[in-house]
Amino acid sequence: TDYLTYKSKSEVKNVFDDASKMGLKVIRIWGNLDVGKKTGEIDSQSGHETFEGNNDGTGEKDGVYFQYWDDEAGKPVVNEGEDGLRHLDYIIKQAEEHDMKLVITFTNYWEAFGGMGQYVKWYQMSQGKSVGNSKVDEKDTCDFYTNETIKSWYKDYIKTLLNHTNYYTGEKLMDSEAVFSWELSNEPRCTVDEFCKDDILYNWAKEMSAYVKSIDPYHMVSVGDEGFYNLGYQEAARQDLPSSAYSGYYGVDFDKLMTIDTVDFGTPHMYVDQWGFDLGDDDLEWIKRHAQTTS
């Protein structure tokens, strides 16, 4: 439900009303909406601020943005105002009023809402590079896991978000009864080849999950990965398993990630068509294997 992050109060309330009637107890939402730097111009049609250097091409969503690049500060700055984190505040308020819980993500591997690539673009801006409104390539995206400056910005955002005071409730976000867990990213991956080794994501997840716990030890933390395994190409073939999901190609090792003390649960996804799964065989094996890994 990524659209909750930027939609109107009435739309957000309607979603929670409907979800409550359906008996839903937990909703996952995006806790990030990152854009480039302000152009100083207003869009004549929408009346919204405009930005340049957006990783997803468009930047703000309905005028809402959570982080943007500030040339004067020389770093990304958090927008805690009416068109910023106050949107998240209202979502949390509605969750509390409907007795529901939220899984809140900190970033996204994909370009939607800026994601990891926006951090990379911010770093490029800090180095005086000219950046356009298009997503960065995969090689540069993987710098998100290893560049120390980028990692410090990511940690700064986490610290600000968890300590942010909700405009409507007066509580820090991390003290809200609506928080079920924090998620490091939506679907983090780092394709293994000459620029990304299979321990990069593990090391990043270990460091960042520990950092979250150092601020908020009372809520669960998940990595947010899709649950890929790292059996190797030969072993995946020997077991007649879909290579993309089991070989380790995406730089994710679900078995290893589940050994991190500061990671509380796994988040396997399943895209049957995209991953070449056979219905009834591969999908059931995927579910059973993850259940076994986390048991």
Q: What are the residue ranges of the model-derived segments?
A:
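Alpha-helix termination/capping residues and helix-transition junctions
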Residues: 21-23, 97, 173-176, 259-260
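Detector for Asparagine
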Residues: 14, 32, 54-55, 79, ...
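Aromatic- and acidic-residue-enriched segments that line the glycan-binding/catalytic groove
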Residues: 39-68, 79, 97, 107-143, ...
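Extracellular glycoside hydrolase catalytic/binding regions
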Residues: 142-146, 152, 156-174, 181-295
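Short, charge-rich amphipathic segments
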Residues: 1, 81-91, 133-145, 252
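Low-complexity, flexible helical/coil segments
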Residues: 29-30, 74-75, 140-148
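Active-site-adjacent substrate/metal-binding segments within catalytic domains
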Residues: 1-114, 159-160, 265
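Soluble non-cytosolic domains of exported or imported proteins
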Residues: 6-10, 79-86, 144, 148, ...
